[in-house]
Amino acid sequence: MRSDQIKKGLKQAPARAMLRAVGVGDEDFGRPFVGVVNTFTDGMPCNFHLRELAQHLKAGLKEAGLFPFEFGAPAISDGISMGTPGMRASLVSREVIADSVELIAQGYLYDGMVGLSACDKTIPGTAMGVIRSGVPGMILYGGTIAPGEWQGRKLTIVEVFEAVGQRAAGKISEEELLEIERRAIPGPGACGGQYTANTMAMALEALGLSPVGYNAIPAVHPEKERATKEAGKILAWAIAHDWKPKDFLTRKSFLNAIAAVAATGGSTNAVLHLLALAKEAGVELSLDDFDQISRKTPVIADLRPWGTYTAWELYEAGGTALVFKRLLEAGLLFGEEKTLTGRTLAEEVERAYREQEGQKVVFPVEKALKPHGGLVVLKGNLAPKGAVLKLAGTERTYFEGPARVFDSEEAAMEKVLKGEIRPGDVVVIRYVGPKGAPGMPEMLSVTSAIVGEGLGPEVALLTDGRFSGGTRGLMIGHIAPEAFVGGPIALLEEGDRIRIDVEGRRLEVLLPEEELERRRARWRPRPPAFTHGLFARYAALVRQADEGAVLEDPL
C-alpha cells in the first residue's frame, strides 16, 4: 500500500505515535488509509449538512475495511457572493480546492481519496484534485435542496433573484419580495434546479466518477444516509483493484457527460468544468465537442431554470438513472464505458433504474421537449475562440440590436434597475473574464433582473464572464479571448450593431475589419485588479474560457 511509506517500518515509529493520538489502533495500520475532503461550511446551505454526512461516509469506509481521515477545503457560495466583489473568489476556489486535495493526498500518501462536495465549485474542484492525486477515488455530492413554496408554487433561489427585478419594476411589493426571500430556501442542500451544482453532479455520474443514482438523492432525503455508507464498499473495491479515475475516464466518458448536460438543459458552467476535468485526466476535449453533442442530443427533462420541475422532483421521478436509461435506449450514450465500480455505465444504469408511475419530468427521446440540446457554441469576429449560450433557456435564434457597453456588472445592474435598458438592446459586460475580474464572475444578478423586469425575450446579454446555472434568456458568456487580453469585445463602443445568429453559430459586430483594426491600434491594456496575493497569481496563470479557465502548467 502507498500509505505503508508513512505507517510501516522501524523509522516510522514517530509517525505511528502521532497517528495513534488521532485514533489509529494496532489493527488499523494494516488498513488502506483514505483521505476524505469535506467541503463543509456553516456559511451557506449547500454544504451546511456535510459535517453530518461525513460521519456516515466515514462509518461506511470503516465498515468496508478502510481507515478514513477527514480534512477541509474552502467553499464559496455563488448565491451569497453574486453581484458583489466576493464573486471573484468563486472560480478561483475551484483551483484552490483541487490543489488542496492534491496537497493532502501527496503529503499523507493516502491509498484512496473521496471528495464530499455540494456547491458549484466544490464539485469540479474536488474531482480535479482526486483525478490529479493518482489514487483510487470518487466524488459524492451532498444533494439538492428541497424546494420552497409560496402561493402554491415551488421556489428556488432563482425566483428570489428574479423577484429583485420584479420589485424594481413595481410588479411585486416589498412585502411579497420579503416573503419570497423567507420561503425560498427551507434547509440544507444545493440550489434546486438543473443549475450548476446539480448539472455537475449528474455529469460526474455519467463520467463514472460518482455512483450512478447517488448524486440525485436530495440532501435531506432519508435514503442519503444509507447510500453514503454503502459508498464505502465501492472505494474499498477500487483500492483493492488499484482502479484509478485515469483508468476509466476516456474521451467517450466525457462525451457521455456532455450528452447528459445537453439532455437536461444544464448549466453552461459544465463547459468550463468538463474541459478542466478532461485536462486532469489527459483526455482531449474542445468547445466543438459540446456543440456537436448538443446538436444531436434532444432535451428530454423538463427542469428549471427553463422548465417546470426541480431537482427534488427529478429524483422522485427516477433520478439520473432514468435520464441515462432514456439516452441509452436512443443510442446517445456510450454504455460500454467503465465506471468507478468496474462495471459499465449501462450496467450501473440497469442496477439503479426506477421510474415513478405517471411521472412528467423525463420523456422518451421520441417525445423530446426540444429537438436539440441546450449548449450552443458561437464564433465570429466578437468571439474568435468561441462563446457559449444555453439555448434551452430561450426560443429566440436570431437577434440584432445596438450594444449597451459596460465595463462592470455593477454599472450594468444600475442601468437595468433604473429601467434604462430597452427592448432590442444588447447588453455587453466586459473586463470580467478569467484574467480581467479576475475569476470570471457569474452575472446572475443582472440577468435575473432583466428577466424579472419582463425584458428576458427582448434583450440579449454578452459577457466574457460566466452565467449561473439558473440563468435563462438570450445570454451569451465565456467570450474568448476576453477584453483584458485585447479580445474583440474590448473594441466595442456604445451603439455598435451586434448580430447573434444561433442557427449559423455566429456572434458578430457589424463593422468592417478596417474599423476594428483602427480601434485595436488605439486600445491599451488595463492594469491588473490585484498586484499581489492569490488573485494576482491566479490572474497571471489562468488560461482563457475556451480552455476551461485552468491554470498554466510550468512545462
Swiss-Prot record:
Its cofactor is [2Fe-2S] cluster; Mg(2+). It comes from the Bacteria. GO terms for molecular function: 2 iron, 2 sulfur cluster binding; dihydroxy-acid dehydratase activity; magnesium ion binding. Binds 1 [2Fe-2S] cluster per subunit. This cluster acts as a Lewis acid cofactor. The keyword ATP-binding does not apply. [2Fe-2S] cluster binds at C46, C119, C191. GO terms for biological process: isoleucine biosynthetic process; L-valine biosynthetic process. It catalyses: (2R)-2,3-dihydroxy-3-methylbutanoate = 3-methyl-2-oxobutanoate + H2O; (2R,3R)-2,3-dihydroxy-3-methylpentanoate = (S)-3-methyl-2-oxopentanoate + H2O. The modification N6-carboxylysine is found at K121. Mg(2+) binds at D78, D120, K121, E442. Its EC number is 4.2.1.9. Keywords: 2Fe-2S, Amino-acid biosynthesis, Branched-chain amino acid biosynthesis, Iron, Iron-sulfur, Lyase, Magnesium, Metal-binding. The keyword GTP-binding does not apply. InterPro entries: DHAD_IlvD/Edd, Dihydro-acid_dehy_C, DihydroxyA_deHydtase, DiOHA_6PGluconate_deHydtase_CS, ILV_EDD_C, ILV_EDD_N, IlvD/EDD_N. The active site is at S468 (proton acceptor). Pathway: Amino-acid biosynthesis; L-isoleucine biosynthesis; L-isoleucine from 2-oxobutanoate: step 3/4; Amino-acid biosynthesis; L-valine biosynthesis; L-valine from pyruvate: step 3/4. Belongs to the IlvD/Edd family. Homodimer. Functions in the biosynthesis of branched-chain amino acids. Catalyzes the dehydration of (2R,3R)-2,3-dihydroxy-3-methylpentanoate (2,3-dihydroxy-3-methylvalerate) into 2-oxo-3-methylpentanoate (2-oxo-3-methylvalerate) and of (2R)-2,3-dihydroxy-3-methylbutanoate (2,3-dihydroxyisovalerate) into 2-oxo-3-methylbutanoate (2-oxoisovalerate), the penultimate precursor to L-isoleucine and L-valine, respectively. This is Dihydroxy-acid dehydratase. It comes from Thermus thermophilus (strain ATCC 27634 / DSM 579 / HB8). The lineage of its organism: Bacteria, Thermotogati, Deinococcota, Deinococci, Thermales. The gene is ilvD.
